[in-house]
Amino acid sequence: MPKADIHPEWYPEAKVYCNGEVVMTVGSTQPEIHVDVWSGNHPYFTGTQKIIDTEGRVERFMRKYSKQEGSGSKSNKSKSTKSKKGKGKK
């Protein structure tokens, strides 16, 4: 038996609104739920999604990080020499 006066009120027929229209009813602790997107107007679920990938993700990643290899190797060398010097001073 649940404890009295600690549970929120349950609304078995709570209305879900999207753009001012009732799109569905669900059970909730709120009588009305206002949403911006739901499965009825989301591009993925309606089939109107357009994927525009002018450059592949792998190619973009390789191009981005291949430029940084030359500059990144200099900073790695200076860090490694500093750490070796610091260990010998103890």
UniProtKB/Swiss-Prot annotation:
Biased composition (Basic residues): 76-90
Keyword Cell cycle: no
GO molecular function, one term: structural constituent of ribosome
InterPro entries: Ribosomal_bL28/bL31-like_sf, Ribosomal_bL31, Ribosomal_bL31_A, Ribosomal_bL31_sf
SUPFAM superfamilies: L28p-like (SSF143800)
PROSITE patterns the record matches: RIBOSOMAL_L31
Family: Belongs to the bacterial ribosomal protein bL31 family. Type A subfamily.
Family annotation (PANTHER family): 50S RIBOSOMAL PROTEIN L31, CHLOROPLASTIC, LARGE RIBOSOMAL SUBUNIT PROTEIN BL31C
Protein name according to UniProt: Large ribosomal subunit protein bL31
Provenance organism: Trichodesmium erythraeum (strain IMS101)
Lineage: Bacteria, Bacillati, Cyanobacteriota, Cyanophyceae, Oscillatoriophycideae
